Amino acid sequence: MKGMILFISCILLIGIVVECKEGYLMDHEGCKLSCFIRPSGYCGRECAIKKGSSGYCAWPACYCYGLPNWVKVWERATNRCGKK
């Protein structure tokens, strides 16, 4: 029983320590990466290129899970899309 509690505690701790980022990928202009007219699987491939665990087309932009912290994702607060 103590072993099971220790195992579960370790799993929870690992989940807290190894945090991964998720969000919308950005293009070179700071806009969400569009998938509106892209083929099936496009977003999954783009997320994999950025070392993400998975991704999908959250119409009309690519959304990724499990991204490393160095990948920039679109955020409403820092949105620079279409601004100069």
UniProtKB/Swiss-Prot annotation:
A GO BP entry: defense response
Q: Which CDD domains match?
A: neurotoxins_LC_scorpion (cd23106)
Matches recorded under Pfam families: Toxin_3
Q: Which cysteines are joined by disulfide bonds?
A: 31-81, 35-57, 43-62, 47-64
Where's it mainly located?
secreted
Of the GO CC terms on this record, one is: extracellular region
Which residue range or ranges hold the LCN-type CS-alpha/beta domain?
A: 21-82
Tell me where in or outside the cell this protein is found.
Secreted
Q: Which InterPro entries does the record associate with it? A: LCN-type_CS_alpha_beta_dom, Scorpion_toxin-like, Scorpion_toxin-like_sf, Scorpion_toxinL, Scorpion_toxinL/defensin
Report a single Gene Ontology molecular function.
toxin activity
Which sequence positions carry the modification called Cysteine amide? 81
Per the record's keyword annotation, is Secreted included, yes or no?
yes
Signal sequence, renumbered to the chain:
1-20
**Organs and tissues of expression:** Expressed by the venom gland.
Provide this UniProt record's keywords sorted from A to Z.
Amidation, Disulfide bond, Ion channel impairing toxin, Neurotoxin, Secreted, Signal, Toxin, Voltage-gated sodium channel impairing toxin
- Mention any additional remark: Negative results: does not produce significant modification of hNav1.1/SCN1A and hNav1.6/SCN8A currents. This toxin is thought to be responsible for the intoxication symptoms caused by the sting of this species to humans.
Family indicated by similarity: Belongs to the long (4 C-C) scorpion toxin superfamily. Sodium channel inhibitor family. Beta subfamily.
Q: What is known of its domains?
A: Has the structural arrangement of an alpha-helix connected to antiparallel beta-sheets by disulfide bonds (CS-alpha/beta).
Function (record text)? Beta toxins modify sodium channel function in two ways: an excitatory effect (shifting the activation process to more negative potential) and/or a depressant effect (reducing the peak current). At concentration of 500 nM this toxin produces channel opening at more negative potentials in hNav1.2/SCN2A and hNav1.3/SCN3A, which shows the biggest effect. On the other hand the peak current is decreased in hNav1.4/SCN4A and hNav1.5/SCN5A channels, without apparent modification of the activation gate. This toxin is active against mammals.
Identification of the protein by name: Beta-mammal Tt1g
Native source organism of the sequence: Tityus trivittatus
